[in-house]
Amino acid sequence: MPDTFESVLNNVNTHSCPSDLRITDMRFADIVGAPMHCTLMKIYTNQGLVGYGEVRDGATKTYALMLKRLLLGENPCNVDKIFRRIKQFGGQARQGGGVSGVEVALWDLAGKAFGVPVYQMLGGKFRDRVRIYCDTDVSGKPDGMKMGHALKERMAKGYTFLKMDVGTMLISDEPGALSYPTGLWD
């Protein structure tokens, strides 16, 4: 049964008035000891709702904190408006991890405010299960044999979709394998 306007309104958090929701603070929690260091972002609102995002891709909370002044007082349900305002501070560099973390936290807040799963706001449910992949970095794996061993370990854990960041150093000695400006790697 497709959602109707009334059914969506019935799911709205009665302790939240989405149009009056405002961002009041942004804080961070560092997760250490997992497979890698991870910084979680928490965006707080005037109605007690908290949205969570992750600062990723080599970014630090310092980069994400630079965005805080652009968020305070804004309605987190205006995800696209806020994203357009902060995306100039992202890109593919380290700052991008802060911008994407903010966007995830905003969607989390909007879903909580309206009482619906985020996927519902992004076009609806497409499938019941999502296949995940496991990233495998190259550090400590200087050759194909060690990388292959690491990939097999992940497969033994049940992963069926693998990603590896091989880099170019594993094939830099192979004639014709790489094309780059003369003298770049000398």
Label every model-predicted segment.
Residues F5, N11, N46-V116:
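Metal- or metallocofactor-binding catalytic centers and their adjacent structured scaffolds
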Residues F5-Y52:
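Structured beta-strand/loop patches that form or line metal/cofactor-binding pockets in enzymes
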Residues D30, D57, V166:
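Residues that line or immediately flank small-molecule/substrate-binding pockets and catalytic motifs
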Residues I31-P35, T60-K61, K141:
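Short glycine/serine/proline-enriched coil/turn segments at secondary-structure junctions
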Residues G124-V130:
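Short, conserved phosphate-binding/catalytic loop or strand-edge motifs used
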Residues R129, D135-D186:
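Metal-dependent enolase-superfamily TIM-barrel catalytic cores that perform enediolate-based chemistry
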